[in-house]
Amino acid sequence: MSAAATMAPVSLRIHAIAYGADDVLLFDLRAPARDGLAPFDAGAHIDLRLPRGITRSYSLLNDPAERHRYVIGVKREPESRGGSAWLHADARVGALIEVDGPSNHFALDESAPHAVFIAGGIGITPLWSMVQRLEHLGTPWTLHYRARSRRGAALLDELAGHGDRVHLSFSDEGAPSLDLAAIVAAAPEGAHFYCCGPVPMLEAFEAACVGLDPARVHLEYFAAKEAPATEGGFVVHLARSGRTIPIAAGCTILDALQAGGVAVPSSCQQGVCGICETAVLAGVPDHRDLVLSDQERAAGRTMMICCSGSKTAELTLDL
């Protein structure tokens, strides 16, 4: 089930910036007055409000038992539109950043008898938080971690102390791609499976888990799986303001609202972060996101307006 943040943003200070791997920096964020931070569960993320109106979501990688800090890993992306590029080039220790959250669309099932984690690249970050939580609970787990190289793999030092529960695989060393079907087949009975990484890995993971109880399969996308709905041809009624916005072909609902001067929080523009989640009061959404569960999609009570459209000629939103 989706979990949208409902708290007001807080100002956190960058306490430390550390090297995580090639093109990966680790940011330690703390409250300026040394106040305790809002608690979070393993798998959660926070939303950073950055300069130029940019909001970006980053997974929390530290132990959920910690109440004094949030730690995120930020990979510099070549195609960055300002999020990771600004954090790598301009963020400084001591600076304040507005933060929303935590929120969690990738929750750990703590009742499972065993957890199997599959990480690709920077996708290790939420899974490392889950590992730390399971260590406190005494629940057995295994981790399969694939990256292009050791230099580009984050958290290797932290993982080194966990012995044969951690299986590393690096493409530049000639290691074959992870055999996800074999990993799933070899897992203990009742195990839950978690995957976070690039789209091809996630699609292969979903294929390997076909036939399993969906409640045992958990995944988080960092990028869109399908194209946004830009067919247009419908209108959106804004219940609070009384405005009606036509959605033309070639733009999303979010595009049209922003062009009309309607301020709506957003970040990824791909339907993976959940920031733009909006309540639907009437009409049938055409869901294209990777946040809502199948049950939530069927209910049609909420949608991600950055990527989803409408199956009906009119859609009424709680805006």
UniProtKB/Swiss-Prot annotation:
[2Fe-2S] cluster binds at residues 268, 273, 276, 306. Keywords: 2Fe-2S, Aromatic hydrocarbons catabolism, Electron transport, Flavoprotein, FMN, Iron, Iron-sulfur, Metal-binding, NAD, Oxidoreductase, Plasmid, Transport. The keyword Transport applies. It is an enzyme of class 1 (oxidoreductase). GO terms for biological process: catabolic process. One of its GO terms (molecular function) is 2 iron, 2 sulfur cluster binding. Its cofactor is FMN. Induction: By 3- or 4-carboxydiphenyl ether and by phenol. PANTHER family: CARNITINE MONOOXYGENASE REDUCTASE SUBUNIT, NADH OXIDOREDUCTASE HCR. This is Phenoxybenzoate dioxygenase subunit beta. It comes from Ectopseudomonas oleovorans. The lineage of its organism: Bacteria, Pseudomonadati, Pseudomonadota, Gammaproteobacteria, Pseudomonadales.
